[in-house]
Amino acid sequence: MSKCYITGKTTLFGNRRSHAMNATKRIWKANLQNVKIVDENGKVQKVKISARALKKLKLQRA
């Protein structure tokens, strides 16, 4: 399963509820973006990062 490299966000499972409160299964997928970053060793690494983490954190991008 896809997972955010920083926050660990993954897919969430739950129910869709109609007006009559009938439940059907649905999923929420994290908004993951492929990003190249420079790690602490100076190596370029391709990782998946959630859009929120990308917005909040100042990463050194390659």
Swiss-Prot record:
Disulfide bridge map: none
Top-level taxonomic group: Bacteria
Record's keyword terms, sorted: Ribonucleoprotein, Ribosomal protein
Listed GO CC annotations: ribonucleoprotein complex; ribosome
Annotated GO MF terms: structural constituent of ribosome
BP term (GO), one: translation
Transmembrane segments: none
PANTHER family for this protein: 50S RIBOSOMAL PROTEIN L28, LARGE RIBOSOMAL SUBUNIT PROTEIN BL28A
Family of this protein: Belongs to the bacterial ribosomal protein bL28 family.
NCBIfam families: L28
Official protein name in the record: Large ribosomal subunit protein bL28
Gene for this chain: rpmB
